[in-house]
Every structure is written in structure tokens, then in C-alpha cells.
């Protein structure tokens, strides 16, 4: 049961400091990742994606709203924020959730992100504020 608590606690800590110093050891080497923009396999590709966010986005932040484990599945609800490196530096927000599946060794073998908005909604945030 200690391992069960550890992965949830590790994920909570990773969300708090996202995208800095993520704990990649909780992922299987061949982890499957999918979100509305990407679909790939492998922890190295996952590391590259997180490094891209860390390098090119301004002030990225992940607010964790909830985390729940049921059997071999962990569900998180979150909002990802960042400023895009455009001259007017718009603040972007993507609310969503993740479904993480664990193997028998308690490693994440599947990480699928879902957004509560469309890709077009994200593009629009770069040019229109909610007050317009």
C-alpha cells in the first residue's frame, strides 16, 4: 500500500513544480502518451515534450484540482496555464483531465490527456480575451 500512496504523492509533487524536475522514473520506458496534439510512445519522447514546454512557454503552471486512484487507473483534473512568447504574451489556460494506467510494477504505461476545450479555443485565446 505504501507504493500506492507514493505514486499519487509523487504525481501531486510533480504537478506543483511542473514542468521542472518531473519524476520520469514513475513511467514505463515504452509509456504511451496521447493528447489533442500528440500521440507517441516512449518516456524519452515524453521528456522531450516536457522540455519543450519548459523551454518555450513563459511561466507554465499546472493547477491540480483533484487526483484519484481506482485500481490500476489514476485520474487527475487540472488546468494548464502559460504565457505564449508573442509580443503581447497572452496567458493561455487549458482545463482538462488525465487518465493514467499502471502496470503490475506500479509504473505508468499509458498517459492520456483530455481537454475541456477545443484546439480552436486555445488558438483563440492567443488573440481574444474573454472580455472582448
Identify the function of each model-found stretch.
Residues 1-132:
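C-terminal and inter-domain tail/linker signature
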Amino acid at each position: 500500500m505504501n507504493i500506492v500512496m507514493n505514486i499519487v504523492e509523487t504525481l501531486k509533487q510533480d504537478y506543483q513544480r511542473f514542468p521542472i524536475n518531473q519524476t520520469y522514473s514513475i513511467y514505463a520506458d515504452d509509456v504511451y502518451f496521447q493528447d489533442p496534439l500528440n500521440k507517441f510512445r516512449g518516456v524519452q519522447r515524453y521528456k522531450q515534450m516536457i522540455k519543450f514546454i519548459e523551454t518555450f512557454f513563459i511561466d507554465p503552471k499546472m493547477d491540480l484540482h483533484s487526483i484519484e486512484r481506482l485500481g490500476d487507473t489514476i485520474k487527475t483534473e487540472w488546468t494548464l496555464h502559460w504565457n505564449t512568447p508573442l509580443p503581447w504574451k497572452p496567458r493561455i489556460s487549458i482545463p482538462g483531465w488525465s487518465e493514467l494506467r499502471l502496470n503490475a510494477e506500479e509504473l505508468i504505461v499509458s498517459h492520456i490527456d483530455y481537454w475541456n476545450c477545443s484546439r480552436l479555443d486555445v488558438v483563440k485565446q492567443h488573440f481574444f480575451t474573454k472580455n472582448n
